[in-house]
């Protein structure tokens, strides 16, 4: 649909460096400064809950008590009531300046529309779901949404048994960035199946493998 075409820009500059939470904080603060007059809704998502907590406290320290920005934390520990007390004002535009730090809980079933996103990379499926939380209503005032991807918690070590964490199938691979931009997920799933087939090939004889796929 033309309304949603190019509504979100994916930025990979933070993947070019070994990111630290202090470096990430500086980057977020710079974006906040650029949006000081107009305001912005910023979503920052981590894989690990502890990292989300750590970054929340770093941002709280940086903002101080007098900041006009609302700083909120959302994890799986929150009750439905606590979660809604954060999400409702965001949905209803009560807060013009808000930073929401979260775990991947925001990827599924959370109805919010943010302007700027930061995400620790994991599976490509997760990246696509995250993009769905940014600029959902399309380009605002001529400004598209933007998502900065970074690599902090090394998702391949967390999801060790998930073949989708093979580097060639993540945003560590330039081709997957194109897949994400152009929404060519058929290419992604074909490569996932190819990789799975290779893995099966190591575990079974060639005849057994061909039988496995011919029967599936």
Task: State where each predicted segment sits.
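Conserved ATPase-coupling elements of RecA-like P-loop NTPase cores
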Residues: 110-114
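A short helix-to-beta-strand connector/capping loop
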Residues: 6-10, 66-69, 96
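A short beta-strand-to-loop transition that corresponds to the Sensor-1 phosphate-sensing loop
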Residues: 1, 46-49, 102-105
């Amino acid at each position: 649909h033309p309304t949603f075409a190019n509504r979100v820009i994916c930025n990979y500059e933070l993947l070019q460096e070994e990111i630290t939470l202090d470096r990430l904080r500086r980057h977020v603060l710079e974006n906040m400064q650029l949006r000081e007059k107009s305001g912005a809704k910023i979503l920052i998502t981590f894989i690990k809950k502890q990292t989300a907590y750590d970054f929340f406290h770093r941002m709280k320290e940086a903002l101080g008590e007098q900041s006009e920005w609302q700083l909120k934390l959302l994890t799986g520990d929150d009750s439905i009531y606590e979660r809604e007390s954060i999400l409702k004002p965001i949905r209803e535009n009560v807060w013009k300046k808000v930073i929401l730090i979260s775990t991947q809980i925001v990827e599924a079933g959370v109805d919010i529309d943010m302007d700027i996103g930061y995400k620790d990379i994991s599976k490509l499926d997760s990246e696509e779901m995250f993009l769905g939380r940014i600029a959902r209503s399309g380009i605002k005032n001529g400004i598209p949404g933007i998502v900065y991807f970074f690599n902090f918690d090394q998702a391949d070590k967390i999801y060790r048994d998930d073949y989708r964490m093979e580097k060639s199938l993540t945003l560590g691979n330039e081709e997957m960035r194109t897949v994400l931009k152009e929404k060519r997920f058929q290419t992604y799933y074909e490569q996932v199946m190819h990789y799975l087939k290779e893995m099966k090939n190591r575990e079974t004889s060639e005849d057994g493998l061909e039988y496995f796929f011919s029967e599936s």
